[in-house]
C-alpha cells in the first residue's frame, strides 16, 4: 500500500468479514497503518467477546450474519478481508467443499460477492487453509478468482508458511491479495530466517494437566460422533507415536468449525 498514503486524518477504511477477534486489525496496528474499522461481521459469542475486549471502540459495529447484511447501509471501505470458514475445505474437517448454494459453512465465501459488487473496495484480502488450492477444491478457487477479474481486480495468491515469517509453527495457509484497477504490482514479503524455534519455548518438564488423559481422549472421540452426525466441525484424530515420554507433545485438531 506504499502508493496510497493513509494518515490519522485519512485512515484506511476497513471491513472484516468472518472477523474472529480480528487479527487483521492487530496486523495493521503492528505495521503502523492508520485505519478505521467501519464494520465487522461475526456470530460466534466467544469471538465477539474477544473482539470487544480488544477493540471496545468498535463494539457497536458488528453487522452479524453476513447473509443478512444490507451493504447499501454499510459505510464505504477501502479494504475488505474475508477469511471465510475453512471447515469444509480443511483436511481436519469433512471436506464437503464450498460450492455456491451447497449450504456448507465454507460456501459462505460466495456471500462476499454482494459486498464487493456494492462497495467496490480497493483491496481484498483472503486467508484460508492450504486445501483450498488442492486438486479437489481448486476449481472453486479458480472460479472465484475469475469472478474477481471480471469485477476489475488483479489477484495475487501464494501458499505461505508461518515458520518462514518468524513464527515457530509449521502452518501453511493460502493468502490472496486482490487490487482494483490500475496499481503497482504486488509482491508478497520475502521469507525470514527463523530465530526462535519450538525447542526454545518448550519446558523440559511438563505439568500433568497438559497431558491428555484416557478419559479426555474418550471425550474427544465421542465429540467426533456429534460432529459427524451434524456434518460439521473438525475431528479429533489421535495418533500413536513411539517416542520417549519426554519427546511427546500432545495435540488435537478439535475445533468448533470456525
Annotate each language-model stretch with its function.
Residues 84-85:
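Short glycine-/small-residue-rich Rossmann-like dinucleotide-binding loops
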Residues 15-67:
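SAM cofactor-binding core of SAM-dependent methyltransferases
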Residues 12:
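Nucleotide donor/acceptor-binding cores
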Residues 8, 32-34, 74, 118:
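Alpha-helix termination/capping residues and helix-transition junctions
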Residues 69-79, 89-258:
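Class I S-adenosyl-L-methionine
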Residues 20, 35, 58, 81, ...:
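Short, functionally important structural connectors and interaction interfaces within domains
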Residues 40, 63, 81, 125-126:
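Generic enzyme active-site microenvironment
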Residues 1-9:
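A short, basic/flexible loop-to-alpha-helix module at the beginning of a structural domain
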Amino acid at each position: 500500500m506504499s502508493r496510497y498514503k493513509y494518515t490519522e486524518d485519512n485512515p484506511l477504511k476497513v471491513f472484516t468479514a468472518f472477523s474472529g477477534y480480528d487479527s487483521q486489525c492487530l496486523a495493521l496496528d503492528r505495521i503502523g497503518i492508520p485505519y478505521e474499522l467501519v464494520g465487522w461481521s461475526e456470530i460466534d459469542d466467544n469471538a465477539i467477546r474477544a473482539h470487544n475486549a480488544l477493540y471496545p471502540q468498535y463494539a457497536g459495529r458488528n453487522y452479524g450474519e453476513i447473509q443478512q447484511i444490507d451493504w447499501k447501509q454499510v459505510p464505504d471501505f477501502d479494504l475488505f478481508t474475508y477469511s471465510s470458514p475453512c471447515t469444509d475445505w480443511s483436511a481436519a474437517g469433512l471436506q464437503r467443499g464450498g460450492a455456491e448454494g451447497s449450504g456448507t459453512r465454507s460456501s459462505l465465501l460466495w456471500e462476499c460477492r454482494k459486498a464487493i459488487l456494492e462497495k467496490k473496495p480497493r483491496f481484498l484480502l483472503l486467508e484460508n487453509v492450504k486445501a483450498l488450492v488442492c486438486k479437489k477444491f481448486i476449481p472453486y478457487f479458480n472460479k472465484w478468482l475469475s469472478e474477481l477479474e471480471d469485477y476489475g481486480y488483479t489477484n495475487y495468491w501464494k501458499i505461505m508458511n508461518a515458520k518462514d515469517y518468524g513464527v515457530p509453527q509449521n502452518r501453511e495457509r493460502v493468502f490472496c491479495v486482490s487490487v482494483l484497477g490500475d496499481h503497482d504490482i504486488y509482491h508478497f514479503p520475502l521469507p525470514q530466517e527463523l530465530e526462535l524455534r519450538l525447542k526454545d519455548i518448550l519446558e523440559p518438564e511438563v505439568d500433568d494437566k497438559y497431558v491428555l488423559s484416557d478419559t479426555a481422549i474418550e471425550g474427544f472421540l465421542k465429540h467426533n460422533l456429534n460432529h459427524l452426525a451434524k456434518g460439521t466441525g473438525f475431528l479429533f484424530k489421535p495418533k500413536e507415536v513411539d517416542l520417549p515420554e519426554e519427546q511427546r507433545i500432545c495435540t488435537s485438531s478439535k475445533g468448533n468449525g470456525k
